[in-house]
Amino acid sequence: MSLEAKSVGLAVVMWSYPRGGKLDKAGETALDVCAYAAHMAALLGAHIIKVKPPTDVLWQPEAKAAYEKASIDISTLDKRIAHVMQASFNGRRIVVFSGGEAKDLEGLFTEVRGLRDGGANGSIIGRNTFQRPREQALDMLDKIVGIYQGKM
């Protein structure tokens, strides 16, 4: 499908959400799993990749050993985002991160700062916008834009 889309000048956008098999809820957002999902989307030809922000969980025992051996820092969201960006052809793909469950404003702004600092290309902010009154949502979005612009 990606070759067909590219042949007619369309960008390929892929939601790369790992699910199924033996993967549990914690595994869906584990750093090793999210980074691999982003990498696979890039290999499949995606120009734009959407993944969930990764947690500091390492789901696969083999990955945990490899991360420890390579001394990969996974302690903060920005470090984990940077790792996902590296897995996406070292930043040569656009990677946006889902907003997830509704959060309080400070929690959301803290997450957006971590995404920005890790090199994310953006956020998909759905329910965090639409589940708020219009004026509050617009103010929130203005602040998020300011964060990505480095003004906040």
What role is predicted for each listed range?
Residues 23-25, 131-134:
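A generic structural signal for short coil/turn motifs at secondary-structure boundaries
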